[in-house]
């Protein structure tokens, strides 16, 4: 398999698991076995523990500068904010509506990139986003929305903004050049801690 095909395959596989995770967490939370935040903590903690041995070995071979470490930790904070905001929106939105709204992530990345870096958005990109918006409209059952649904929409939009900030921050700081195992381990570890603090804080509000 050529490097290009291998990269495309891994990217599709990554997208599959990224999309599967919230579906599984939503189903688990509805059974009462765990809350949304509990599911997120388990997700990020297990990922961190699985990556930890490989991350330590890679970090020992090539230590990460403190500046890049801080930048990576901030990426983890944005990741935690993205997930926590999305799952918080489910308190006011049906799960299907919340997931549909999350498809706005690419649109926010495009708009933020255009605003910050003055990038031109191609007609093809607008067409793809228009198709996504039509899909969201078809997936959303507006009659199922509860009173106060605007709060859920606000949290879903905050989640999309956090995701866009995560993408733009990583691109601006060239974090894709870092060791992927070390980077992912730090991001998921920070996200697990961030979600835990969010869960504790919400319990005392």
For each feature predicted by the language model, list its residue ranges.
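Glycine-/small-residue-enriched transmembrane alpha-helix faces in small-molecule transporters
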Residues: 1-38, 77, 81, 85, ...
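Hydrophobic transmembrane alpha-helices of multi-pass small-molecule transport proteins
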Residues: 51, 112, 121-141, 160, ...
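Specific transmembrane alpha-helical segments of multi-pass solute transporters/efflux pumps
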Residues: 17, 55-96, 102, 138
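Specific alpha-helical transmembrane segments that line the substrate/conduction pathway
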Residues: 38-49, 87-119, 159
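Loop-to-transmembrane alpha-helix entry segments
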Residues: 66, 99-102, 118-138, 149-153
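Small-residue-rich packing faces within the transmembrane alpha-helices of Major Facilitator Superfamily
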Residues: 19-20, 45-49, 107, 133, ...
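Juxtamembrane helix-start motifs in multi-pass secondary transporters
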Residues: 39, 180-184
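Conserved small/polar residues in nucleotide/adenosyl-binding loops
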Residues: 203-205
């Amino acid at each position: 398999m050529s490097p290009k095909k291998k990269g495309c395959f891994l990217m599709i596989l990554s997208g599959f698991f990224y999309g599967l995770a919230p579906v599984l967490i939503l189903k688990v939370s509805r059974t009462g076995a765990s809350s949304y935040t509990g599911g997120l903590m388990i997700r990020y903690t297990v990922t961190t523990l699985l990556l930890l041995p490989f991350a330590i070995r890679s970090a020992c071979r090539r230590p990460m500068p403190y500046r890049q470490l801080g930048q990576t930790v901030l990426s983890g904070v944005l990741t935690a904010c993205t997930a926590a905001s999305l799952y918080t929106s489910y308190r006011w939105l049906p799960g299907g509506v919340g997931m549909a709204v999350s498809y706005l992530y690419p649109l926010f990345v495009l708009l933020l990139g255009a605003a910050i870096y003055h990038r031109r958005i191609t007609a093809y990109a607008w067409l793809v986003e228009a198709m996504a918006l039509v899909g969201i409209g078809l997936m959303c059952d507006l009659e199922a929305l509860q009173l106060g649904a605007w709060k859920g929409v606000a949290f879903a939009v905050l989640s999309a903004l956090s995701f866009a900030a995560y993408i733009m921050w990583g691109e601006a700081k060239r974090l894709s050049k870092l060791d992927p195992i070390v980077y992912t381990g730090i991001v998921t570890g920070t996200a697990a801690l961030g979600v835990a603090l969010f869960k504790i804080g919400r319990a005392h509000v």
